[in-house]
Amino acid sequence: MPALSVPSGARSRRALRGLAAATALAVVPALGVATTATAQQGHRSTISQSSHDRQLAPRTHFTMQADGSSGLTAGGEGIPNIDSVKKTIATYYGDPGTGIADKASSPYISEMAATLEDQKTYLKTAYNHAVRQGEKPALVFDADDTTLWTYDMEVADMHFNFDPARQDVWVQEQRFPATPGMVSFVNTAAAMGFTVFGLTGRNDNQKAATVANLAKVGYTAFPEDRFYTKWTGVGSSQQPAYITCAAAKCTTVEYKAGTRKHIEDLGYDIVLNVGDQWSDLQGGYADRILKLPNPTYYLPSPDLPGLSEPRLAPRTHFTMKPDGSSGLTVSGEAIPNIDSVKKTIATYYGDPGTGISNKSASPYISEMSALVEKQQKRVVQACATGARQGTKPAIVLDADDTTLWTYDMEVADMHFNFNPAEQDVWVKDERFPATPSMVGLADAAATAGCTIVGLTGRNDNQREATLGNLAKVGYTGFTEANYYTKWTGVGSSQQPAYITCAAAKCTTIEYKSQTRRHVESAAGGGYDIVANFGDQFSDLKGGYADHAVKLPNPTYYLP
């Protein structure tokens, strides 16, 4: 869907009235289990890459409410993975991975150009109509990601974690480039005869720098007396008399709609109101609105009391490939907004906003409990059967988010931006709690006759601490001999002879699948891997297990 442009009603002085609409919330089923082909003679647990690995892939269709509430019902696989969302956003903005948007060519720039081109005919018609009616036609523009482009700040500097102190540095130093296509659009409209107003959530202390930044990048139509910023409550910067709010603190919609009403009370007709957030556009007092694409943050606000505008809301259905390539073809509105994804993940883990998951009750814990209960019966039966038949049954368990739970590190500490040095601190300090229900599964498998094998992407220097952490939280079946960590390439920690890779650096699948093959070989113990558990599809691909069990994890993606 392209950027949205809709009429705001028969007359801009009337607040918008939308049609009531009910949006059905899709409940995504809990995770399934990928089951391998029957063991073949000579390769007891080897699976067919072509037939089975194709099933081991992330979901591509999602239903997500913007407020995060889908985390209550969607299941972990039904939540857009945040790493895939980041890659999709980067692709859309032409960001090669540096956090810097391409300023010359990108899907975002192309969409902006097409969106603004579509408005030109409307502006000419609307201007001529207003003049014939003896009105003073005006346009209203938001600042951030409407006239000034914040991507480089949001991503390269803040890594999708907004910091008001850092933002103020960018504002005061006037660092922002113009939003693509907007300088020409605004200046052309001003030359046509429109009066141009700015209306932003930036505060009064940032007004002078913002107006200067706009002029610096080429805008000619934003004088300070037509540029509205929000009061700070300090000194002379107080709430204007023309704005009244239902509570002591005004909502964004109350502030912006009230300011637009004030502009119209001055005798102007707001022909078009342009913003990148729905809260820029709600509340009426404009003949038409234009929603610009922005999946990099979400600033919701309650609408005006008694006003319903169901059309002015984010989309809820998304198609997204895990590798980020969807950013080449979908519109900005069709990319899951990263702030909504974060809220959905937080809801799923019972995180109240602190970055700390609920350790007692959450949708994640419930899903893990149901999944493990189902799989434990299958695993215990396979272990018992193998033990009776003398086939040396074993289960393989990944570490992070399979046996040890990393959410608090990933969110409270790293804010969804992985830091290997900080991760090493958590590992060496043995800080991780157990992944819900997994201690019981491992114990039941061991009691039924299975050997417990650990296989992780953590390195050899982290093996001792990882085994210590596992024992600390209640696991009893892991041993040094059957716990596989990745080589560092330093000293005696070298690539094992039983692993060969297509390139100098092994992929996760090469490392893990060939380690499982080794475990099933005579040299590795001659085990029959009856089940392989992991939270990443790369933990499971490549065969050498009778069953592969994918655990939910929307907090990172390791292809």
Which residues does each predicted region cover?
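Non-catalytic pre-domain segments flanking phosphatase-related domains
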Residues: P2-F141, P305-L397
